Regions:
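N-terminal, membrane-interfacial amphipathic/helix-forming hydrophobic leader that caps
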Residues: 1-140, 282-296
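Transmembrane helix-loop-helix hairpins at the membrane interface
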Residues: 2-6, 13-27, 147-159, 171-296
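Helix-to-loop transition at the C-terminal end of transmembrane segments
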Residues: 30-35, 79-80, 155-169
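Short helix-terminus and kink motifs of transmembrane alpha helices
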Residues: 68-77, 121, 156-160, 164, ...
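Membrane interface segments of multi-pass transport proteins and intramembrane proteases
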Residues: 80-89, 129-132, 166-172, 219-227
């Protein structure tokens, strides 16, 4: 019996191989650059610290949490019927996921802009130390994304194996993917799925970069060292995603996003990197979902 060719497996393999080659070439170019150019590229302190003190920062975070909780509570009371003891648990659907994302992201964005609008003395400091257009930011983000993506893959593989050891030892229970990832793999109404993908690629990177890098990282930078601020903000970023399987890889992603923000001096580069990462992850989910050879 002749072996059958699995087209999605071939496409996925070519994509991975292409990214590995591109990453290798970019790292070689980076290493071979003249020292003065490398030193100029790695100069830090491009991002203005957010020195507002713990009290004002605490007020801001409390406002964000309160707004999210209030909006989600109101939305739940309007769109969801309270479950009875005999009813089945609420199943996450694409439409429900869209509302969940919107009612999480929009309140955070609203608090951020309201604070800057009504209390500019504390909350309206500049996010960027370097001016970049969207196209220039994208040109900076693409090579950085290609350079660091294999590092994220390696971290994911190592962490998955560590979790397998923990699971075999009985230290952790069944390891599940993020609910949104499972939902995207399962599929649904095309319009709802497209909206969900758009939120993941467009809205989530913008809001999360503003909050986690533009606010949390810049504040931590004013209180501690750059490396500590990058690590702590990366940990907070990962914890907020509430998934054990992606916990350590997302810490690395959060650290990389903070370092990219710091070294380029413009939040748009981090937003583009984040958008590329989410888009690539969704693309690979789509490809693997069509494969009979790749485990889902």
């Amino acid at each position: 019996m002749e072996p059958t060719i699995d087209p999605p497996l071939v496409v996925a393999s070519l994509v991975f191989f292409g990214i590995l080659v591109a990453s290798f070439v970019l790292w070689i170019q980076h290493i071979r650059r003249p020292k003065n150019i490398v030193r100029e590229m790695t100069t830090e302190n491009c991002v203005p610290a957010w020195n507002i003190g713990w009290v004002n920062f605490g007020i801001f975070i409390c406002a964000v949490v309160t707004a999210v909780f209030a909006v989600q509570s109101i939305a739940s009371s309007i769109f969801l019927q309270p479950p009875s003891e005999s009813s089945d648990p609420i199943t996450l659907t694409p439409s429900l996921a869209i509302f969940a994302v919107l009612f999480l992201q929009l309140p955070m964005l609203a608090v951020f802009y309201a604070a800057r609008r009504f209390y500019p003395g504390h909350y309206a400091s500049g996010l960027n130390g370097v001016d970049l257009t969207h196209s220039n930011a994208l040109r900076k983000a693409v090579p950085l994304f290609l350079m660091f993506l294999p590092l994220i893959w390696i971290t994911s593989i190592i962490w998955a194996n560590v979790l397998s050891v923990f699971q075999a030892a009985g230290w952790v229970e069944e390891i599940e993917q993020q609910e949104l990832v499972s939902l995207l793999q399962a599929g649904g109404h095309p319009v709802a799925m497209l909206l969900l993908v758009a939120l993941a690629i467009v809205m989530a990177p913008i809001v999360e970069e503003i909050i986690f890098r533009g606010c949390i990282y810049r504040f931590l930078k004013s209180q501690t060292s750059l490396m500590a601020a990058q690590i702590i903000s990366g940990c907070v970023f990962s914890i907020m995603h509430a998934n054990l399987l992606s916990f350590v890889p997302l810490i690395l992603v959060g650290i990389l996003l903070a370092r990219i923000y710091e070294k380029t001096g413009n939040l748009r580069v981090s937003i583009w990197f984040h958008a590329l990462f989410n888009a690539f992850s969704l693309l690979m989910l789509f490809i693997t979902s069509m494969s009979d050879a790749i485990p889902h």
